[in-house]
Amino acid sequence: MKPVWIYDTKDDTDATIVIEETDEGVFLYTANQVDKRGENGKATVADCNIRKFNALTGELIWQKDYQCVYNYYINGGALGTPILGKDDISNMVIFNICFTGSNSDGTMVALDKKTGNEIWKKKLASYSWCSPLDFKSSDGKTYMVYSDFAGKMYLLDPMNGKTLDSVSLEGNVESSPAIYNDTIVVGSYARKIFGIKVK
């Protein structure tokens, strides 16, 4: 194997990179965390950099920055895989970002795929490590869920970020959820796996 392009992200990339093939080209969406830039007292805050690249050339298409708090034992920034919108939310990519105001909170953002501009931004009282999940209902509308450090799963409208419902998972959630038909399955620190019915 031979690298054809390299980009210095300035920090760790723990969140899975997502790829999209369109009529305009093939693109990557990615975000880093706040880790190496804060080591040994170098910084108490740094930006989580959300970026879109041309997947074939490495050209940076756009970048959106969100300031995060550095914590030596738990990293801020993006750790979960973003939602790559499709169907009725095909214009957006959605990221959850940890520690955007303190070492306990977070932010969920939906960005326009073409421009990187914010479509909506939602302040999270508790940060989220796990990947958000989108799914389509029987009426053809897309919904999304995410789980947080406080042990709750939230149902959102991805068009505007509005919370529609929530349920307790009894402990912090690091795992990413899976869905089959109308049942979401996820594990938590409660040492349990939950099957959540969505209506």
Residue map of PLM features:
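Extracytoplasmic/lumenal domain signature
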Residues: 1-199
